[in-house]
Each structure stands twice: as structure tokens, then as C-alpha cells.
Amino acid sequence: MIETQKLLACVVLVTCGNVEEAETIAKTIVTERLAACVNVVGRSEGMQSIFIWDNLLQKESEILLLIKTMPEHLPQLENRIQELHSYSVPEFIVLPVILGGQSYMQWIKDSVSQG
């Protein structure tokens, strides 16, 4: 496991059932300085997610959020996603950023530190 204090930043993956929910979550967490930036992917056509839920194969159109943040904000970010999200079990997958442009990494840090 990677130690979070050694990470430059994190990218968090969250899927949403529609554009409105995705944009509401994105705007809220950026405004609250829990994220520096959120990319809303699949706005026009969505993306297809295939998974098993309640023992049935599901195929749903979803919107993907790519959330850029710092490791120290992950617990609060996860709690906020839980509060805002309509899914009973929202996706919350953290990808470590171990290398990135120095000025961009600093921008992420500065953006979430101002809150």
C-alpha cells in the first residue's frame, strides 16, 4: 500500500446516474475546496457501466467524475460524496498520483488548501 503522505495528489473516480447530479456534486466539492478540479466525463452520451446488483446483471448509462484532490482531504471528500449522492453505494475509488507537473501539483495543493 502506498503511504498517503508520499503522494503528490489523488484522482478520485465517482460515477453518477445523470448529468445534473454529477454537476451538483462537482460544483459543491470544488466550492467547498475538497477538490481542485472535477472533470465531468460523458455529459452528452454518458458511458455504459455493466455490473451485478442484487444478483442481476445491470447495464446503466452513467457519468464519470474525475476528482483531483490531496490525500488529506479524502476522508472528508468521501463523507461529502456519501451525503450528496443518490446511490446507496456510490463509487469512490482513489488513484494515487505519484508523478505530475510541478506547477499543476502545486495548483491542486493550493486550491484545496484555501478552504
Ranges and model annotations:
Residues M1-G115:
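Positively charged, small/polar-rich N-terminal and surface patches that mediate targeting and assembly
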